[in-house]
Amino acid sequence: FFIDTATSDINTLSHHDALPISRDGNMQKVLVVVDMQNDFIDGALGTKEAVAIVPGVKEKIENFDGVVLFTRDTHETYYLDTQEGQKLPVPHCIRDTEGWQIRSELDALRKTEPIDKETFGSTDLAGELVAMNEDNEIKSITFVGLCTDICVISNALLAKASLPEVPIIVDAKCCAGVTPESHENALKAMEVCQIQIDR
């Protein structure tokens, strides 16, 4: 993979073909960047807390010594007819809209295709992590992104259930919730479930 600086186009690998940037012994580290999309940052469901974590997430990706995966919340035009749409009647992350796009400064760092997901937790992501671990043992999986209390907690718990012997880490400084209170509640819930919270 490479970034063409002349056109800013990214030539991407599939997730499973992604090679770790470097390894600790024979073990690889994984960073999962959850739903860092415009609608969750300063769009339809944006918050000032989400805006505030963007520089830290960018730095985390740039300095991460391992494989970086991205998830992308993806809804269709009939979103309001879905169960989620009925409970949260705010159209967001509709496929091919500006709000659906990963934040540009983060997307420029992406080296694999995003894992699109229609709901909070991604079984595709969990399956990808299991497959990666079978190919080359994973030392740790770190989660950052949005929202702490919805999609971060859902995917961190799926990873914990799928790979119970792999340390799961959430970088609290690089996450934001729907509210500061729900962010803290989610961190506490994950900690009870033996997920490491880095503050």
Where are these regions (language model features)?
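Internal catalytic-core helix/loop-beta-alpha segment
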Residues: D96-I150
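Short, small-residue-biased leader/transition segments that mark boundaries at the very start
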Residues: A6-L19
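Histidine-anchored nucleotide/phosphate-binding helix
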Residues: V57-I61, I153-L163
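Active-site-proximal beta-strand/loop segments in catalytic clefts of secreted hydrolases
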Residues: T71-T74, E118, L146, K173-C174
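Active-site acidic carboxylates
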Residues: R23-P114, D135, I169, V178, ...
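Metal-ion/cofactor- or nucleotide/acyl-coenzyme-handling active-site neighborhoods
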Residues: T142-F143, L158-A161, V178
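Short, small-residue-enriched loops and turns at beta-alpha junctions
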Residues: S122-T123, C175-T179
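Right-handed beta-helix
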Residues: F1-T5
